[in-house]
């Protein structure tokens, strides 16, 4: 591979930008839509067990978010370094980046598996008031679910890294296959393992977790296969996974801010659960349902985001200013359009969305208000997400971190806390649009600085 120094330029530097962005993003958007559908269907089946089971899965969300943050953030660092190295024709460095990414995921998996074994019950007990009559049931459900998800988390973590490698080299079609197959397997296995269909044992919430990890492991296996057989830009081998400090440092210069940025979401969900729990466990369940529903809107935008990062990074390495600007403009237009559709759906039929999860009258009362208020920030979020992906592609991980901290920690939790104590439960949801207005304003300021510092100077 390395002897091909005269190879044809990657399509990310030559294909028309609109066509390239659609080509790069559509497979990931489609696969993430399937992934979002799985998230929704999974929770629908869990809600049929009981509202306590649904609450338990909602309370597990912060740790699952943290796990995704570590895998996704490291993947962002690998993606940016790999794409930039390919754009600069530094093929040996690109190869090393891919192998270090795989090694880092193996190490991260061990840490989460250990927490799954020893820390799961304590994590749920920290969120549930022991005096509640259903506290033991929620903790039991949650511990069973989270232990399985973490002990077998090597599937999702390695899958995410391998998919980032495929994305960075323009092989996005294969990421659609891996994510799609994994999600479909999960959806098929959910009712079978939860309710004991087709001769399978009735596992309840443990069945939901088992279906999840089986789907993830199958997706990981496909991602390994595609990287070995279809990806000629990099070569994965255990012999090449000897730690390389400079490469790991380059990965985490972008990756650690991205990890922290996504982990902030974990802190936010944990904090919101603590703010909502004194009102009722139903309010916590509503918050969890909102995140499942919003994934169907946000996941396609994240798929678009994953397509944008390697395109901008590659063209930054190749010093192609106009292609970078076209990518950003077109990305924002698509993102805001998707978010507008999502906002309209949430405003029009919140009750029908909630009834998918077997919502009780109390859940409907709380949830209809929550969905209609929260969705008002969707279009603003669409702009912020694209700007954050731009910062990441330029290696400006700190800028992404600052924006994420503003929208998911610095503003939203204090706002939610104050609104809860002054105005009550229904006012809490206004913290989302308040935080988004602040973060988008700050994002615009940072982007103007980035433009004058890096983009404007390109040929």
What residue spans do the PLM features occupy?
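Short alpha-helical transmembrane segments in multi-pass integral membrane proteins
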Residues: 1-25, 82-154, 201-256, 312-377, ...
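Interfacial/gating helices of multi-pass transporter permease domains
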Residues: 23, 46-65, 136-141, 205-206, ...
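Transmembrane helical elements of multi-pass membrane transporters/channels
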Residues: 23-42, 148, 182, 215-219, ...
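Hydrophobic/aromatic residues within transmembrane alpha-helices of membrane transport systems
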Residues: 30, 42-46, 57, 82, ...
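Helix-terminus/linker motif at the lipid-water interface of multi-pass membrane proteins
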Residues: 33, 37-55, 124-136, 192-203, ...
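Small-residue-rich hydrophobic transmembrane alpha-helices
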Residues: 54-114, 156-175, 286-344, 348, ...
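Hydrophobic transmembrane alpha-helices of multi-pass small-molecule transporters
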Residues: 66-69, 186-191, 220-224, 296-299, ...
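Short runs within selected transmembrane alpha-helices of multi-pass transporters and secretion channels
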Residues: 75, 149-167, 175-183, 208-221, ...
